[in-house]
């Protein structure tokens, strides 16, 4: 339904991908239509790590890499899309301020600092989504660099200097947790389970995954 409300033209222009059922915008719309008694009580919408940020700092905020997967972010300009928010009847106060990943978003509240045994001068930065944090950690921070990860999902992740739209609609273009940079990402959500199924059905139980990789 979110496709009919927002339209793929707006999604493609700002989120650089058509409406996707697994991303946040579609989930918000589902709750609005199927659980209106819950949605009418909603004051803020936060991603998991951003809820932890709120508990630590009292700040409603997010950062560009994780916010890219909401389909509400204007990815080329690294800010919330006014057009998508208007179409969905959302506003920035509900979603929180958008930061770059390295920016300080707040400081640990005194009562939280006391509970944790740390100083209340401890800064909490924007952070990053799981795959983009992995990209930074493995050095995918320059043109020509890419990585592949296999866990629950299997992901191919590559650096980009520009917010390029994939005309085939097969990969995401999201903000990197590096200012002025983006990344391409393709993902198969069942990759880990598929690899385990292949190993269990076609190889001896004691065979290491390294041998499967060599065979592949």
Task: Please annotate each region the language model reported.
Residues 3-61, 66, 71-82, 86-89, ...:
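Active-site core segments that coordinate phosphate-bearing ligands/cofactors
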Residues 89-100:
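A conserved helix-loop-beta module that forms one wall/lid of the active-site cleft
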């Amino acid at each position: 339904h979110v496709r009919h409300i927002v339209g793929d033209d707006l999604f493609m222009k700002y989120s650089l991908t058509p409406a996707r059922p697994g991303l946040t915008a579609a989930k918000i719309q589902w709750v609005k239509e199927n659980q209106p008694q819950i949605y009418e009580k909603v004051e803020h919408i936060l991603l998991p790590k951003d809820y932890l940020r709120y508990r630590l700092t009292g700040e409603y905020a997010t950062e560009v890499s994780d916010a890219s997967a909401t389909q509400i972010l204007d990815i080329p300009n690294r800010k919330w899309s006014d057009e998508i928010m208007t179409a969905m009847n959302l506003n920035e106060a509900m979603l929180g301020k958008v930061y770059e990943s390295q920016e300080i978003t707040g400081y640990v509240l005194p009562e939280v600092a006391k509970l944790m045994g740390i100083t209340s001068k401890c800064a909490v930065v924007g952070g990053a989504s799981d795959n983009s944090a992995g990209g930074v950690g493995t050095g995918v921070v320059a043109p020509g660099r890419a990585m592949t990860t296999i866990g629950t999902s299997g992901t191919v992740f590559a650096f980009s200097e520009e917010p390029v739209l994939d005309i085939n609609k097969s990969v995401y273009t999201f903000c990197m947790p590096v200012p002025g940079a983006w990344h391409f990402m393709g993902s198969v959500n069942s990759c880990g389970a598929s690899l385990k199924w292949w190993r269990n059905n076609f190889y001896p139980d004691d065979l290491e995954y390294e041998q499967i990789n060599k065979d592949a």
